[in-house]
Amino acid sequence: MLQCRPAQEFSFGPRALKDALVSTDAALQQLYVSAFSPAERLFLAEAYNPQRTLFCTLLIRTGFDWLLSRPEAPEDFQTFHASLQHRKPRLARKHIYLQPIDLSEEPVGSSLLHQLCSCTEAFFLGLRVKCLPSVAAASIRCSSRPSRDSDRLQLHTDGILSFLKNNKPGDALCVLGLTLSDLYPHEAWSFTFSKFLPGHEVGVCSFARFSGEFPKSGPSAPDLALVEAAADGPEAPLQDRGWALCFSALGMVQCCKVTCHELCHLLGLGNCRWLRCLMQGALSLDEALRRPLDLCPICLRKLQHVLGFRLIERYQRLYTWTQAVVGTWPSQEAGEPSVWEDTPPASADSGMCCESDSEPGTSVSEPLTPDAGSHTFASGPEEGLSYLAASEAPLPPGGPAEAIKEHERWLAMCIQALQREVAEEDLVQVDRAVDALDRWEMFTGQLPATRQDPPSSRDSVGLRKVLGDKFSSLRRKLSARKLARAESAPRPWDGEES
């Protein structure tokens, strides 16, 4: 049984966090100064300010956390900026397309899509979000299988990604498929929340694990043909064939999280290892639920560089959206299952793993790589981590509504900080204090080089002599023992002959 231990902080230190945000390159430092006002720079300085109050240090709760299980070099702004050089023409497009898959126009589906569009337009301020008409999974002709942990039907991600790539609108910056069906990327994996196709700006994410209650009766095995090939008769969305959906306000926020996380990947942002951030990867549902709804300052600078928004305007839009969610979305009733209660933690007999996107596939014909924010369960330890029991995420005090109101209060604090009158001297004081600190050791994502000492003939000869004498002594002792045993052993045939 796993022992419960307090979470431990994970940090690269203030100096490294400052370099990750501002950069060590003189041109990028000048770009930072010109892109942000003094108030914005002091706000972003929360990334490396040891006295920060708005952004939190990463916590490690188990030895199986994503941070420890997927070691790799963290992506700072300079690395991100260099990766954008070949993406400039595509960034001129201003439309994000959401492609519902088997999401009918019933109240639950339409309300969810409306909230997703509103959240996405606030999160990616400056881009227009268009929701395409829902398509049936049967028309996509993607592979499918029965779920291993329920009677639901799972859709294979590769067929969906191929469909999205081939039907991508000409003015699309990116296209994201949305489905309430469970997804799986490989036969050996139990499920995944999301996956994207690098180089083509298409991805897909599933909300099946975030619904207030899992489907009580999903399509059975004979229904597989409805998805693997187009049916002769009228096509019915999956919800109409047994899906019982109930999204609480908190469950809807989880859907927004995975949607914005995946769209950030499609805009070029990598996974985050700096502070608590939406762009953290996750190897368990518990880690996915613990991710915040917004970006850390380092990832926020990346997104601002791509879209060019003012920070306060973005936070004001997000604040307005959060107020609307609290006021209009159905609250969790007493006794009603929630995403926190209905979704069990991973049991000890499920191996959990997640592939890194450090080696992405570049075409549909090549092996596709789930992003490091996708959450996959392997049926065998050879797919990644062996066995893991994830702790259940605790329900925030006051229930799901209080958790959303807490985020609303955090957004209000961000707006207040950005409205403050800030002098350059305030920034200089923070920078001077951080620059005076010692630099911490920083993991580079590469194994340390093997140490090679200069050759020394004297040391080599002496070592060989010592080892040779030692082995000769052991050989003599073993020979003496064998001889003594042979002489003292009884020989029954001598008695028989006499």
Curated annotation (Swiss-Prot):
GO terms for biological process: proteolysis. SUPFAM superfamilies: Metalloproteases ('zincins'), catalytic domain (SSF55486). Its EC number is 3.4.-.-. It is an enzyme of class 3 (hydrolase). The active site is at residue 262. GO terms for molecular function: metal ion binding; metallopeptidase activity. Zn(2+) 2 binds at residues 272, 277, 296, 299. Keywords: Hydrolase, Metal-binding, Metalloprotease, Protease, Zinc. InterPro entries: Archaemetzincin, MetalloPept_cat_dom_sf, Pept_M54_archaemetzincn. Residues 332-381 are annotated as: Disordered. It comes from the Eukaryota. Binds 2 Zn(2+) ions per subunit. One is catalytic, whereas the other seems to have a structural role. PANTHER family: ARCHAEMETZINCIN-1 (PTHR32205:SF4), ARCHAEMETZINCIN-2-RELATED (PTHR32205). This is Archaemetzincin-1. It comes from Homo sapiens (Human).
